[in-house]
Design a protein with these regions (language model features):
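Terminal alpha-helical segments
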Residues: 1-140
């Protein structure tokens, strides 16, 4: 396994941990909507960074999903249709982590955040052609 494949795999696995944490939390403590959406955003961020490594594209470490998508799209227009969905998660990286920020969340928003993270994961793993087992038992 090349170093690049190893690094990509590590980023995907970290994203899977975030997505798994989001789903387990939502299942067991459904009131923690902010925590669930935060982990969905983190999962998408890590999946996008995995793809940037696949592209050999340098990036600054940032929670800005639009910035990461902009970099990806410079070399792969297949991600252009992700802007609208990924932008829904943009505010869940930092702002939602602080008590003085008010972001309205509902079960529908959380369900959508989980779905977005899963779709981005599917797109990235398909593109990088790395199969990483994903625990679908906890899927809702």
């Amino acid at each position: 396994m090349s170093e690049q494949v190893k690094e990509i795999s590590q980023w995907i696995i970290k994203g899977d941990h975030d997505l798994g944490t989001a789903k387990i939390t939502y299942f067991h403590i459904p009131e923690y909507l902010d925590t669930v959406t935060f982990h969905c955003q983190q999962a998408v961020e890590r999946y996008l960074k995995a793809y940037l490594i696949f592209q050999s594209t340098s990036f600054r470490f940032s929670h800005d999903l639009i910035y990461l998508l902009d970099l990806i799209i410079q070399n792969d227009s297949d991600f252009e249709n992700c802007y609208d969905t990924v932008s829904e998660l943009q505010g869940y990286a930092v702002e939602i982590r602080y008590p003085n920020e008010t972001i309205y969340l509902s079960n529908e928003i959380v369900d959508q955040a989980i779905l977005i993270a899963k779709k981005i994961r599917d797109l990235v793993t398909e593109k990088v052609k790395i199969k990483i087992d994903y625990n679908e038992i906890i899927d809702k």
